[in-house]
Amino acid sequence: MENYQLVLASTSPFRQQLLEKLAIPFSTLSPNCDETPLEDESPQQLVLRLAESKAQSCQINQPSLVIGSDQVCVINGNIVGKPHNRQNAIAQLTAQSGQSIVFYTGLAVYNSETGETRSCIDEFKVHFRPLTQAQIERYVDKEQPFYCAGSFKSEGLGIALFEKLEGKDPNTLVGLPLIDLIDLLAQQGMQVLG
């Protein structure tokens, strides 16, 4: 299946950087799907549905494997979104101080030729240090994590906020579980290492 094109259904520069680690040429497309949660939809159901929807929403004219991914952050059973501004980022980090949060990342690979979609969910736990208000404000002002779920960038200074990380793939926390992606691509006939 070496004639398949690899497409990332995302405009996220973070996901693009992660996919570049696999050293496979790929293109990106902006997915076109409604990301509104359904009534009574669990975080796991939401990320799986959205990952599949993103992968399937791209208009493709050649045989391609299209990657879709979606992530939510959950604290005390509630989905935490992107803060979008300083005040909300500080509020999120204050609520997360000394707490554990869970990231659920849905991943899907859609084969545009066969119509088959393979998907999975990866879970990653983040345990926050107890943080002072001054530490939180200093972090937010330095890194401005306004478009990151949970109000931090784990690939940057955000690592200073954590006491412990739990999960099989640290890439999951940034938004694209590469270990699972390698498996899903192999199931569709694309071997990362040839």
UniProtKB/Swiss-Prot annotation:
Which parts of the chain span the membrane according to its record?
Answer: none
Cellular localization per UniProt: Cytoplasm
Recorded GO terms, molecular function? nucleoside triphosphate diphosphatase activity
Alphabetical list of InterPro entries matching this protein:
ITPase-like_fam, Maf-like
SUPFAM superfamilies cross-referenced by the UniProt entry: ITPase-like
Record's superkingdom?
A: Bacteria
Principal subcellular localization: cytoplasm
Cellular-component GO terms for this entry:
cytoplasm
What does the record list as GO biological process?
nucleotide metabolic process
Check the UniProt entry and state the signal peptide residues, or none.
Answer: none
Q: Which UniProt keywords apply?
A: Cytoplasm, Hydrolase, Nucleotide metabolism
Q: Which Pfam families match?
A: Maf (PF02545)
The residues responsible for catalysis, as annotated, are D70 (proton acceptor)
Q: Does the keyword Cytoplasm apply?
A: yes
List the cofactors: a divalent metal cation
Question: Would the keyword Cytoplasm be found if you checked this record's keyword annotation?
Answer: yes
Q: For this protein, what is the EC number?
A: 3.6.1.-
Kindly state which reaction or reactions the protein catalyses: N(7)-methyl-GTP + H2O = N(7)-methyl-GMP + diphosphate + H(+)
| Record-marked site positions (Important for substrate specificity) | F14, Q71, E155
By its UniProt entry, which PANTHER family does this protein fall under?
7-METHYL-GTP PYROPHOSPHATASE (PTHR43213:SF10), BIFUNCTIONAL DTTP/UTP PYROPHOSPHATASE/METHYLTRANSFERASE PROTEIN-RELATED (PTHR43213)
Q: Which family does it belong to?
A: Belongs to the Maf family. YceF subfamily.
Which NCBIfam families does the annotation name?
Answer: maf (TIGR00172)
Role this protein plays: Nucleoside triphosphate pyrophosphatase that hydrolyzes 7-methyl-GTP (m(7)GTP). May have a dual role in cell division arrest and in preventing the incorporation of modified nucleotides into cellular nucleic acids.
The record, for HAMAP family, names: Maf
Under which name does UniProt file this protein? Answer: 7-methyl-GTP pyrophosphatase
Which organism is this entry from? Vibrio vulnificus (strain YJ016)
